[in-house]
Amino acid sequence: MAERPAPLFLVVDPGASPDPNVPPGSYAAVGEAGRRRLAIELSRRFGSVGAGVASLHPARPPAGETFHWGRWFTAAARSVLARVRAEGRPLNALGYAGAGALALADDALLAALAAPIPGEAVGNNRFSTDAFMFAAEPSGPLGMDAALAALESCSTDNAAMRCLEAAGFASRDLANATWARFDVDTPLDLALLRLAIRLPGTRRPDGLVAAFLEMASLPGGRGLELPHLQRVGAVLRDPEAQLVVAGRIPSAAWSYLETESACRVRCFIEERGMRSARDAVPHSLLADWTERLGPADLVKELASLGDAVILDSRVIMAARAGSSDASAWPPAEERFASDFLDATPVATAWLAELTAAAAESEVPFLLGGHALVSDGLRILVDAAWLGR
């Protein structure tokens, strides 16, 4: 029997093509440096479970052009395939991982991701994919060309699993595995990661990543610390308190929050899967509120409903921009500063108002993206009980 060829992952490496527009010492620079270290670690860990790795250079579309993930990924994949085949080596299992994907995943999860059977795709999250692998059939309609054709039409990596399903591949979703959904996209996500690795039972990163998380310095000399962590933790432990959470909250995260925290929880769930439904126009009641009554009024209203607020601000950004593409939102540096309640660098008027109001609120606010309101909720709950 012929030996089964090793699977190959294409892993995004931010360091392969650094963004020249990111100034040193900025929030974005910290995020890029952290994700590069995570990509290096993930590549090494894929190798430890028997998978090959090739680096993907981040795409930088010309000004005015929208990034299309599928065309970028499949061009790189076909180039790698041509090189492998020219060397006479077989390859029938191909995968992808973002630089910050699977940062807390254990080796068993990585091994499961790297082991699709022919005609199957395995992903970390069917509805918001950050890492996946498919295995092509040696003959028939589910070959390598069919898979790449399906992925080429996919505008975002978050929709990759559903694109492969539409092409006929069976789907195996690992989203219910512990920490499968945790993905580092932002400096605030790095702060969540730093908190998570201090919790019992979580995987400890290698020395390169761990040292960075401890030594990284944000603008103003701050470390990777979540704003109001102690105050939010006190609310989570208090049966008389109420927590308000708004955004793309997965059912598993909501369930964990309900069962493992002591407080009452009020959830406003909007636009789950908006990044994988790139062609749909996002809509949000909270965004409508900011447009009709102003961002500061939204902060005031949310604060009146509970003793702490956790807000997925990207839903508001997407709805106000009429697009789930981050290139249409306020610039990355402004988004990242807002997450740390720093309104000073925020030039977008509505976001500056929202950020300043949240920072000045008597009720503690946490602002962020999808990681904050998904696996980030579990991190916050577990940390609260440990008094971290």
Segments (PLM) and residue ranges:
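Short loop/turn segments at strand-loop or loop-helix junctions that form parts
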Residues: 9-17, 58-59, 126, 134-137, ...
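A short, N-terminal amphipathic alpha-helix
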Residues: 34-51
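Short beta-strand-to-loop acidic/aromatic patch adjacent to the donor-nucleotide binding site
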Residues: 90-100
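Conserved alpha/beta core of the MobA/IspD/sugar-nucleotide pyrophosphorylase nucleotidyltransferase superfamily
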Residues: 155-388
